[in-house]
Design a protein with these regions (language model features):
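Conserved post-catalytic alpha-helical subdomain immediately downstream of the catalytic base
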Residues: 179-207
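Conserved phosphate/ATP/ADP-binding segment of small-molecule kinases
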Residues: 82, 96-172
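Active-site beta-loop-alpha junctions enriched in small/polar residues
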Residues: 32, 60, 91-95, 121, ...
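Conserved N-terminal subdomain of the carbohydrate kinase-like
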Residues: 1-59
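Hydrophobic beta-strand scaffold residues
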Residues: 86-87
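Surface-exposed amphipathic alpha-helices with a cationic face
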Residues: 73-80, 141
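Glycine/threonine-rich flexible loop motifs
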Residues: 61-70, 98, 126-129
Length: 207
């Protein structure tokens, strides 16, 4: 935990508005002048890199602030050089940056990524990948050397009912769970992070 004692800084927040069919839910990010956006490498203890097994980061971090993006990319390089696994979630948010800028930035990071989390929609739209889902996932491994690629597919039947399933590609094999159809959504905030945390927990515990 890093504490920011500056009286000018604050916690970043965002505002979530639930959807009502046919209108989708929406989010407004309010991260300007937050402590997180002013993070610098000097604030991190130097021994943190060698002590870390998995360093996880999301593309939202890269989109919030130019200075933070530069710091985050340097952190990826330093953790990678120290031998940590790099876990990266390509959760693209159109309200934070353009598809062109996001694509250019994340593709430059992919060669350092061991565990890649990317939805089928993001692969096809922002990253402009074509082919079957299996071909797209295998392509990340073949092109960038990613060890694990996990992708999710979410279909919104309505704002309160979704279909969901996921697929993982690792060591030349695909793993897929039975889909969850028409599940009732109580609150989906953080559901993607929970899925990701489960995958990383499984990797740490079972390899």
């Amino acid at each position: 935990i890093i504490y920011d004692h500056s009286p000018q800084k604050r916690l970043g927040v965002y505002y979530y508005e639930s959807g009502a069919y046919p209108r989708k839910s929406s989010v407004i990010y309010d991260r300007a002048n937050s402590s997180f956006c002013s993070l610098s490498l000097d604030e991190l203890p130097e021994d943190i890199y060698a002590k870390t097994k998995i360093f996880h980061i999301s593309s939202i971090t890269l989109a919030l602030d130019p200075s933070l993006k530069e710091t985050a990319i340097k952190m990826i390089h330093k953790f990678h050089e120290a031998g940590a696994y790099i876990s990266f979630d390509v959760n693209y948010r159109a309200s934070l940056w353009s598809e062109e800028e996001a694509k250019k930035t994340v593709e430059a990071i992919f060669p350092y990524v061991d565990f890649l989390f990317v939805s089928e929609e993001t692969s096809r739209r922002m990253l402009q990948r074509t082919g079957t889902l299996e071909e797209i996932m295998k392509g990340y491994a073949d092109t960038y050397g990613c060890t694990l690629i996990a992708t999710t597919r979410r279909e919104a039947v309505s704002p309160t009912h979704h279909n969901f399933n996921s697929k993982i590609y690792m060591n030349g094999n695909f793993y897929e769970e039975e889909p969850y159809n028409n599940i009732e959504v109580i609150d989906r905030i953080g559901s993607g992070d929970a899925y990701l945390a489960g995958v990383l927990y499984g990797l740490i515990k079972f390899g």
